[in-house]
Amino acid sequence: MKPSEVSNEIRVAVLGEWVPPQLADVLALQRAEEPEIAAALIGGTADDQPAPQPGDGFDLALSTADRQWPGWVCEALWHDTLSIAVAKRSHLLAYREVPCCEVLKQPLIRAQSTAGEPWRVVAQRVLGDALQDREQLVGSFDIALTLVSAGYGIVIAPSARLAGYLNRGIAARPLAGTPTVVMAYLLHPRARLTEPMVRFIQRV
């Protein structure tokens, strides 16, 4: 796909079930500073709706995974730290940061939809590659956090992913000893970008 040389719209594909909260600030800034160029979001997150691919008519993409598309550049965009989601009555709330040894004593729950996200590799490494055989696998992040709220186990995830669930019967604590993780990537064509696209990327 080649970016349109004359367009009053920037089409941004959002890949995955999670939308980074920072995107709202970027869209608001775009609307305030360049209202004549609209930013349109497209995406496919339902099971029967495939994720957009290069050539599907978008200019830029945001992804939680490091995607390698021919002719596109993938750049780390937003970063975060790993946290533990627990039920609000959990004894783990006594810790300011939850030690890895305590995490491995708990029933662990993982959403299948997060399997390809790069922070999973960091979590595995920090916990000594002990997650693979210990986690109960469920279909979506929403289901995983519902089980956490009910006291069935805990979830490891970036802090920003958990923020929207803190009013749904869960609490979060940082996972001790973890490095910063990449939360989202920006993908753009390797070819020359239009001026509106360049300015949009600068706002990001």
Residue map of PLM features:
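Central regulatory/effector-binding core of bacterial HTH transcription factors
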Residues: 7-68
